[in-house]
């Protein structure tokens, strides 16, 4: 069996694509190729072939490289094609026409209509129409794929009426759940992932301002690990930091390697997931909360169901109103004042990951999908 994985909007070394799925599939396949934006034309990493295409500068650029990625995909003559970005649906069936015996999997990371609806990159006058077009075209074309994988139940529900071959592969962490008490805590709070206003970045700064006004927390340290989602967000946050004298309290690392993210989490006391109540965030499950839990740090997260249910199931953190910076600040202080509570919730998080919310069970589902499509016996 030969597998070809396609992406236009992610790094070939994206956590879900490379570290989780591709590495798991090595258990049943020794010929895996990932084609995606990369500055090297060809490289083999951990036995997986990486074939680079030019990195698009923006969303529009991702559409311009569609023909190229499909041409390269067809050259692979793979048995199973697995693609990860919405725009590829418009060209993916060319693979079927050239290679009628191949199987095609669409991996839906997001609720794309909601994503467009809240996107600052889509001009407001055409946002509603674009949302409708994305919704209708995605469902219509997806009927023709052999399998649809989603990252959560809410997105799966969109596709249940158009396909019987839909499965949730949660983006649970692959990190081993280990608490490392030997690492010195350098940061009081961490937020890891893409930094945007919608994900609560400005609310975090407002909470830090409140905490800093208390002499007990004047030296509080907050680290953001990840890239800014868009330039305007960076401008807004930097302006707020400057106007409120928070330069000594806030650290931005930018994008860091997958393995380094874990080191920052170990060096932090509390993990934040303060996503604002946008429609998309009532459906999608943020991966970062599982990664915090796997490192034994309590989670302070928004009240939306995909976040709340994982926090409350194991008492691994505190649920807050993300629109209320006072609520955020008070609950950060509550944890910082109580080391026993931090330890208790951190230990609960490790238990949750070890027993339930881990990649191992998702790996089994993924491999079974490939076995069915590839005609591989379970014996």
What residues fall within each predicted segment?
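Glycosyltransferase donor-sugar binding loop
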Residues: 37-40, 221-236, 254-255
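Active-site donor-binding acidic/aromatic loop of nucleotide-activated sugar
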Residues: 232-234, 247-257, 264
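Acidic donor-binding loop of glycosyltransferase active sites
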Residues: 265-282, 297
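Membrane-proximal helix-turn-helix segments that form the acceptor-binding/catalytic region
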Residues: 23, 66-74, 94-98, 112-114, ...
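A short, well-ordered alpha-helix in the C-terminal region of glycosyltransferases
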Residues: 327, 334, 341-356, 365-368
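Conserved donor-binding/catalytic core segment of Leloir-type glycosyltransferases
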Residues: 4, 149, 181-208, 222-224
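Carbohydrate-associated surface elements
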Residues: 154, 172
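Conserved acidic donor-binding segment of nucleotide-sugar-dependent glycosyltransferases
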Residues: 313-314, 318-325, 334-340
